[in-house]
Amino acid sequence: MKIGVASTLTVYAITAGVFFLIDLFWLGVLAKGFYAKHLGHLLREQVNWPAAVAFYLVYIAGIQVFVVGPALQGGWGVGHTALWGGLLGFFAYCTFDLTALALIKSWPLPVVFVDIAWGTVITAATAAAVIILSRTLIKALGAV
């Protein structure tokens, strides 16, 4: 499926919305106590929103460039898309967590495992959901 610039921007917006909502639920509800327990001494009282927004914009662009775009262009199935999304999440979150473990004193090992698993799951789930939503929207509107 060939998509134009408007469709690419629409799919980016869908990716951003899906990823942000899932991550907000994870960080704000499900894992809030876990991170407070293990990283409480390092956590800010207020989120550094410019840094957070920069992360989301860059990471979502990565999902778009390396997974969702090729999936739409190549006609990948949902499972194939989720697999590649999971791999991207695994490698990206490994990069952060293993670097933190190597360089930051007392970086908690449980955080490494949970965070890498989370990166794998959220990126796989986001990629799969975005493919379903994007294809549905593109078909319904003919092109976005």
Predicted regions, residues:
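Juxtamembrane/disordered regions of integral membrane proteins
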Residues: 2-118, 122-144
